[in-house]
């Protein structure tokens, strides 16, 4: 380790593997049913027992959890407005940690009392505020401090990174990504290709799943790279696909890209603070993420980026601003760039303190519980949801009591998913979704016929999951009656 560099993060014990399986979930449910004396695994009373027995149940108290009556379009004749909502939408926007109010108030008070002097004074000087997040964020993504920066928004950071790393040549100019990537990623890549003088038709490759399948197979991605990698400049996938909820094998795909001389980057919007990441050890070249989903920093809050330490002293052309300049000489103002090293050199402007304060508040939660423990909890919560959906709504399930059936398009393999399950409905979601909302359910719909449901490891519990299923059963009968 070079002098002044941070130590490497701990090596992963099993790549990105989760030890959970459907059999283990079923064994767990049966064990808890035996302990409680509840025979039926779908009984709501079991959810109560599971929640009461959960060693991490107290984390929920660290968050503001919305009441049903505070959500829009809730019908008070159908649900108690004072009851907790069924908030399973943290894959879209995470809930607010209570400590965030305190941290933000500290900086609002500081602004009121100090004005401009807040930039350089206090426990967290604003000009250095992003640096106070680096250790915690580094732990969440498995990186050294100098490999991460807190800056901008996700799409801006994708542009920042692609501007620097996408250097097309006549023979190597393609960018490989998954089909139906999040629109902002798609547009960013299209625009970067055009800005570099190429055409989207020749340089953008959107990989499709096999016919009749919803998700990509890892072996198909690797085969494509091995067969076509000499033409690929950058492999750029989502860590977790926003629509299907598929967690890609980041390590294996990165290795495949490097074998063919490709740079490999990742959009970790749905992976950050959701699943353990080991970007340093997986040898990822660069990555970007937002923080307002599982990171719980608030809508549109500050994003992050990763640049591997192999580029620590790399001075490649990039988008620049005064925050790209080393702090030690930044305020000399001589207009001679002294480029900061590593990920810090990809910053552009000073950090917005209110967004950084939200990040500092969120990191206080992750200081209290490891992402590895949260991941284990997540597997059982999502596994419980999967069991209930398959048992009560599976197309071939004997226990299904409605015409409505649901197909889970998210991979069954726990190694290939995080908190989210994407549910594909046999009836139009435009009929189902409003009825869920009326009953205090917060999930989100994605056309043509998917509702995404995410029991978040930080603040959701088994009761939330079972209440959702109960509402879904009620709505299914209503849809049938009005068909």
Curated annotation (Swiss-Prot):
| Protein's gene | kynu-1
Q: Which GO terms describe its biological process?
A: 'de novo' NAD biosynthetic process from L-tryptophan; anthranilate metabolic process; L-kynurenine catabolic process; L-tryptophan catabolic process to kynurenine; quinolinate biosynthetic process
What Pfam family is a match, any one? KYNU_C
- Cellular component GO terms, alphabetical: cytoplasm
State what protein this is by name: Kynureninase
Q: Where in the cell is it found?
A: Cytoplasm
**Which pathway does it operate in?**
Amino-acid degradation; L-kynurenine degradation; L-alanine and anthranilate from L-kynurenine: step 1/1; Cofactor biosynthesis; NAD(+) biosynthesis; quinolinate from L-kynurenine: step 2/3
Residues that, per the record, bind pyridoxal 5'-phosphate: 154-155, 182-185, 238, 267, 270, 292, 322, 350
Keyword Cytoplasm in the entry? The reply is yes
Tell me what organism the protein belongs to: Caenorhabditis briggsae
Task: Give the top-level enzyme category.
Answer: hydrolase
């Amino acid at each position: 380790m070079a002098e002044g560099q941070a130590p490497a993060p701990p090596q992963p014990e099993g790549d990105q593997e989760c030890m959970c399986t459907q059999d283990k979930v079923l064994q767990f449910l049966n064990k808890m049913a035996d302990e409680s004396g509840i025979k039926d695994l779908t009984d709501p009373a079991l959810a109560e027992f599971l929640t009461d027995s959960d060693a991490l149940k107290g984390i929920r108290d660290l968050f503001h959890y919305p009441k049903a009556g505070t959500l829009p379009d809730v019908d008070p004749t159908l649900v108690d407005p004072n009851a907790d909502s069924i908030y399973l939408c943290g894959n879209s926007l995470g809930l607010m940690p209570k400590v965030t109010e305190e941290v933000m108030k500290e900086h609002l008070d500081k602004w009121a009392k100090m004005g401009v002097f807040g930039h350089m004074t206090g426990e967290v000087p604003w000009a250095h505020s992003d640096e106070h997040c680096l250790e915690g964020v580094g732990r969440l993504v498995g990186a050294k401090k100098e490999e991460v920066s807190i800056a901008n928004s996700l799409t801006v950071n994708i542009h920042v990174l692609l501007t620097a790393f996408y250097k097309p040549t006549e023979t190597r100019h393609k960018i490989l990504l998954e089909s139906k990537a999040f629109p902002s990623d798609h547009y960013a890549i299209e625009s970067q290709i055009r800005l570099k003088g190429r055409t989207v038709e020749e340089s953008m490759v959107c990989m499709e799943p096999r016919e009749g399948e919803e998700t990509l197979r890892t072996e198909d991605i690797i085969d494509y790279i091995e067969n076509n990698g000499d033409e690929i400049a950058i492999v750029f996938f989502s860590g977790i696909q926003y629509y299907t909820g598929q967690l890609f094998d980041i390590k294996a795909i990165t290795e495949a890209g490097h074998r063919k001389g490709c740079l490999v980057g990742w959009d970790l919007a749905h992976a950050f603070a959701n699943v353990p990441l080991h970007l340093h050890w997986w040898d990822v070249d660069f990555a970007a993420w937002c923080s307002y989903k599982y990171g719980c920093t608030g809508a549109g809050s500050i994003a992050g980026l990763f640049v591997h330490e192999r580029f620590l002293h790399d001075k490649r052309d990039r988008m620049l601003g005064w925050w790209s300049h080393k702090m030690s000489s930044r305020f000399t103002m001589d207009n001679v760039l002294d480029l900061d090293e590593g990920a810090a050199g990809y910053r552009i402007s000073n950090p917005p303190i209110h967004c950084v304060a939200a990040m500092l508040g969120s990191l206080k939660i992750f200081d209290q519980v490891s992402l590895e423990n949260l991941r284990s909890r997540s597997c059982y919560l999502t596994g419980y949801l999967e069991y209930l959906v398959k048992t009560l709504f599976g197309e071939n399930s004997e226990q299904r009591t409605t015409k409505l059936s649901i197909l889970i398009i998210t991979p069954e393999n726990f190694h290939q998913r995080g908190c989210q399950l994407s549910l594909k409905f046999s009836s139009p979601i435009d009929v189902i979704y409003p009825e869920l909302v009326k009953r205090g359910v917060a999930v989100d719909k994605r056309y043509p016929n998917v509702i995404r449901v995410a029991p978040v490891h930080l603040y959701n519990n088994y009761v939330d999951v079972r209440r959702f299923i109960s509402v879904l059963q009620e709505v299914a009968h209503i849809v049938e009656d009005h068909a």
